[in-house]
């Protein structure tokens, strides 16, 4: 089901601070995805927060428009993020930051979110010992 419920939103201040300080990041302009493994209060694979800087977009209307596009792209593609996490029986906190200077279209937003999902899946998958042996032999 493609929903984005309240339980899936990251709102706990300590978790947000810890994700920013200890998390790993993936960059795909105009987005930065910061994630860290966390023990969440609810039984979901991940909680997500989306943010657009006030310094780049002075008008709240513009910030809200970008966040709305980000939420919709996340909602439609969240299974690409959550399935790898669920396979490993982990829980993660994820922060999605918008760092661009202009408002992008939904199509651009969705394509960048999909690219982030692919890179995220590659980064969190456990290292395969067979793959490591092949690397060391070469």
Where in this protein do the model-derived segments appear?
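Positively charged, solvent-exposed patches that mediate nucleic-acid binding
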Residues: 1-138
């Amino acid at each position: 089901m493609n929903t984005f419920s309240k339980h899936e939103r990251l709102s706990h201040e300590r978790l947000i601070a810890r994700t920013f300080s200890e998390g790993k990041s993936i960059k795909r302009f105009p987005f930065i995805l910061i994630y860290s493994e966390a023990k969440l209060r609810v039984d979901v694979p991940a909680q997500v927060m989306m943010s657009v800087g006030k310094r780049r977009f002075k008008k709240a209307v513009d910030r809200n428009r970008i966040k709305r596009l980000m939420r919709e792209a996340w909602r439609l593609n969240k299974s690409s993020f959550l399935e790898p996490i669920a396979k490993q029986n982990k829980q993660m906190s994820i922060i999605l930051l918008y760092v661009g200077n202009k408002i992008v279209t939904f199509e651009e937003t969705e394509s960048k979110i999909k690219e982030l999902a692919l890179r995220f899946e590659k980064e969190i998958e456990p290292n395969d010992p067979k793959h490591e042996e092949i690397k060391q032999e070469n």
